[in-house]
A protein has these predicted regions:
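Catalytic histidine-centered segment of alpha/beta-hydrolase-like enzymes
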Residues: 459-470
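Alpha/beta-hydrolase active-site loop
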Residues: 129-130, 139, 159-178
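Short alpha-helix in the alpha/beta-hydrolase fold that links the catalytic acid
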Residues: 418, 432-442
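Catalytic-loop region of hydrolases
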Residues: 18-82, 100, 492
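A catalytic-pocket lid/entrance helix-loop region that shapes and gates access to the active site
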Residues: 104-108, 204, 208-299
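Alpha/beta-hydrolase fold catalytic core
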Residues: 285-431
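Alpha/beta-hydrolase fold nucleophile elbow
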Residues: 183-195
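N-terminal cap/lid subdomain of alpha/beta-hydrolase-fold enzymes
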Residues: 58-159, 441
Length: 494
């Protein structure tokens, strides 16, 4: 298809230094293209480039790389929904959802998500561009985004690399973006994957309270709630059991009574046991009776596919990395993946407490790294010698004062329009689906807003959209959420 290229240089006199290569801090390249989505021809404009981050004194402190897709074969785009998209890490570029989930192009992989050569991209017939425009944002030190440091000064990491600093500067950047692109009338959504779930929970409150930008929806894809994950408590450990069940079922390691049933039939059984029996038992720690300890180990073995004696050796608290090593150890010697436990790996030794590597990451990087570099240069026509950071240096990350869950609750209480969608893969061992459910349940302990929370699960891993069947299903779920979270002319009141 023919593409029309326009260069727009806004404030190109100041530049940032990265790898001793200078990048304009305020520049964009525009191309036009089309894609067939749900058998409907969608024409669109893609604008990609750099937009500055300003501090409270009006000084430029960074420039963020973004890609903005806007449908063009409609009458009025200013009132069309817009989705602001982030990945996680922290330290990850927005590459994953950009060229594998919601964008108009997806990378070339097979139906189960495994890489295919030659690497590249193809049209995405499931993209949500038919119902919403999308901007993919790369935080500082990811993609081509970089800090701007005055000559003779050192980088002040506290401006960017922490849970609250990250939220603050990104909210300001989004305000600028919305103003520049005339999107204040649009219904607004933010979507974040993995740590991006933490990010968008915080952004919902920051945008509303500091930028006066009210959202229609917050979408969390495989969200990481570190307030639970960091505790190492009986609670956080118990929430892993339903994931163990899903992974063991996929690899056919469960007892026949469970293995012969469908996954969605057995997960509620594992969830119920985790909530009603396992959490209370593990809370007793070393004071649990021998009888109860053995009963619990029996049931954990039943639901996890690993041996009772191994569970007892771990005092009922089996780490996930040990599970990835142990599940198939005596079956065929493979390990299973962390972010997607359908993937198998091969270690140097059968012995050990954790896999040598994450088998799914090596597979994904086969595809994503060449695909995004090719796509940006050859399709979007943005060319630079600066390295595209799929994963960038953002440490040490300041995790103090993590109040994002409460921030989301307050934002929802103050904004009757605001709804939340959580999407998780059952085979995700990093940010498990049951942990995501728990986060959703705990966000509003009163239960008075529970009709504004929605959960969707998929037979995939962390990036459920890599599986062809779930790419369609998850995008359709996004469409439904956008439709159902539209105000439809209703007043914002209780």
């Amino acid at each position: 298809m023919k593409k029309y290229l326009t260069f727009i240089f806004l404030i190109s006199f100041i530049s940032i230094e990265a790898q001793d290569i200078r990048i304009p801090i305020d520049t964009s390249v525009t191309t036009n293209s089309e894609v067939l989505i749900n058998n409907q021809k969608i024409t669109y404009q893609a604008k990609t480039g750099m937009q500055p981050v300003w501090n409270d004194h009006g000084e430029i402190i960074a420039s963020l790389y973004y890609t903005y897709y806007k449908r063009t074969n409609i009458k009025n785009s200013s009132k069309r929904p817009i989705i602001m998209s982030f990945n996680g890490g922290p330290g990850s570029a927005s590459v994953w959802m950009h060229i594998a989930y919601t964008g108009p192009k997806v990378l070339r992989i097979d139906d189960e998500g495994y890489p295919i050569q030659p690497y590249g991209v193809k049209d995405n017939p499931n993209s949500i561009l038919d119902v919403a425009d999308i901007v993919y944002v790369n935080p500082v030190n990811t993609g081509y985004s970089r800090p701007v440091v005055k000559s003779g000064k050192k980088l002040d990491k506290s401006l960017f690399f922490g849970i609250n600093a990250d939220i603050k500067y990104l909210a300001g950047w989004l305000n600028t973006f919305i103003s520049r692109n005339n999107r204040w009338q649009s219904p607004k959504y933010i979507i974040g994957e993995s740590y991006g779930g933490t990010r968008v929970m915080g952004l919902a409150a920051e945008l509303q309270n500091k930028q006066w930008m009210y959202l229609n929806g917050v979408i969390m894809v495989s969200p990481a709630d570190y307030k639970v994950l960091r505790t190492g408590s009986a609670l956080s450990s118990s929430l892993n059991l339903p994931y163990f069940t899903a992974a063991a079922w996929y690899h056919k390691m469960l007892p026949d009574e469970l293995q012969n049933k469908d996954l969605l039939e057995i997960l509620p059984l594992s969830e119920e046991y985790a909530i009603n029996k396992l959490i209370p038992a593990m809370a007793k720690g070393g004071f649990i009776s021998d009888t109860e300890r053995n009963e619990v180990a029996d049931r954990m073995s039943y639901f996890s596919g690993i041996k009772k004696d191994v569970i007892l050796q771990h005092n009922l608290d089996v780490p996930k990395d040990y599970f990835w090593k142990e599940l198939l150890r005596n079956e065929n010697g493979f390990t299973i993946g962390r972010l997607d436990s359908r993937y198998r790996g091969l270690d140097k030794r059968l012995a050990g407490d954790s896999p040598d590597y994450n088998s799914e990451i090596t597979s994904w990087l086969h595809s994503f790294t060449p695909a995004i570099n090719y796509y940006i240069r050859e399709h979007l026509k943005f060319k630079t010698d600066v390295t595209y950071n799929v994963f960038g240096p953002v440490g040490p990350w300041d995790n103090r004062n993590d109040n994002v869950r409460e921030g989301l609750r307050k934002a929802m209480a103050q904004n009757p329009y605001l709804k939340v969608l959580v999407q998780s893969g059952y085979y995700d061992g990093a940010t498990t689906y049951f942990n995501a459910k728990y986060t959703m349940w705990q966000t509003d302990p009163s239960g008075r807003m529970k009709d504004r929370f929605f959960f969707k699960g998929y037979r995939s891993g962390h990036m459920m959209y890599l599986r062809s069947e779930d790419l369609k299903k998850s995008n359709d779920d996004l469409r439904d959420f956008i439709k159902n979270s539209s105000s439809n002319g209703k007043s914002a009141k209780y």
